[in-house]
Structure formats: C-alpha cells, structure tokens
Amino acid sequence: MENMDKRSAWDRFYTESSSTTSSFKNFEWFFGFDSVRDFLMPLLRSSSHPDSPVQVLDMGCGTSALGPSIYRHSPVSVHVTCADISPVAVQLMQEKTRLEAVRPSNPSSRLQFVELDCTQLDRRYSPNSLDLIVDKGTTDALLRSKEGKGKAVLVLQQCFRALQGSGSLLQFSDEDPDARLLWLESAALHHDVGVQEVGQLRGVCYFCYQVTPRTPAKC
C-alpha cells in the first residue's frame, strides 16, 4: 500500500474493504486485542484515579476492535477515544457500535470514535490530559511512507504534549528494536524507552515499545 501518510489512501482502503463483504468485519493490523491484553490491563489498573476515569487514546484506530475491547474488558473506569484520520473508518465503527452495542465492564466507562489527524492532537487535547496512548501500526505506516517520516516525529511530539507525567505511549510494531529504539531514543528526549517482545504471528515477530516521561531526579 502506497501513501500511507495520506487521508485519501485510507479512505480508499476502508471503502474498498467494506465493499467486498456483505457484513462488517473489524480489520486488525498485526494482531487483535487478545495478543496485547497483558500489556494493556496492568497499565490501566496502575493509571486508575479514585475520582476520574483513565483517559485512553487509540491513535490511528482504523476499524480495529482494540479500542472497543479495552472499553469492554477494563475493570477500571476508562474513557476510550478511537481516533483516525479517515472519516470512512470512523463512520464504519460508529455504525458498527450503533448496531451492536458494546457493554463495558465498568458502568462509568465511555467509548467514542472521532476523526482526527494525529499530527494535530493539540486541537483536541490539552497538555497532560491522557493516561495512555496506544499506537498499533500507525507510526509504522508513517515511517514506511516516502513523505511520512517527518509526520512520525510530529506525532511523537504531539503524544508527549498530551501525556500526563505518569502516562505511557505504547507502540506495537514489527520493526526490529535495533532500528526503533534508536529512533525513539533520539526523538524522545527526556523520556524513558523500553521494549518487550509481544510474540510471533505468521512468522513475524512483534514488539511493544513503551515510552514514558522521565521523572526528574530528586536532589
């Protein structure tokens, strides 16, 4: 797929994908929720607040069931925003959840789908407003596009602005740590970067890169 940093490419992709089947089916890049459940749930529990929900952004959600699955399975109260640059993908997911309501584990949880260019998170989110940002293949798509590398850095900067001091950015990727860690560490100054192996699927090894704001050293 070419021009993965362009809205028009994704509108075309989701239009064509939805027209090939009579009933809607979620499209998962890499893998689904069950493969990364053990990475997400501990973070949700550790990010929980006594008086407010955990704010979660599924960035570049497409038509994935990841965001709705977080909403469905999280025992703590979450407000999950599934955001994508493609209005076609957003409309498909809105229609899907309208026809098949997703019931949350926590009755105070909320789920929404919004059209949003992730290079412009500041148009929707104030600084220090998100607890968890999930990026499943979105940065990969940008880095593999001819004109997308600069946008990938901008997305990263926007994420850092929106994250709370105790928040986390999770990037799920098939890019080898030798390459991704080098890029993240050079672009994510004042942040800690770690990696864990998710596992292999269809012969491809996937990784979870976690980026968190660095806590200032105490004197």
Where are these regions (language model features)?
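Conserved beta-strand signature within the Rossmann-like core of class I S-adenosyl-L-methionine
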Residues: 166-173
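A short SAM/SAH-binding and catalytic strip from SAM-dependent methyltransferases
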Residues: 131-149
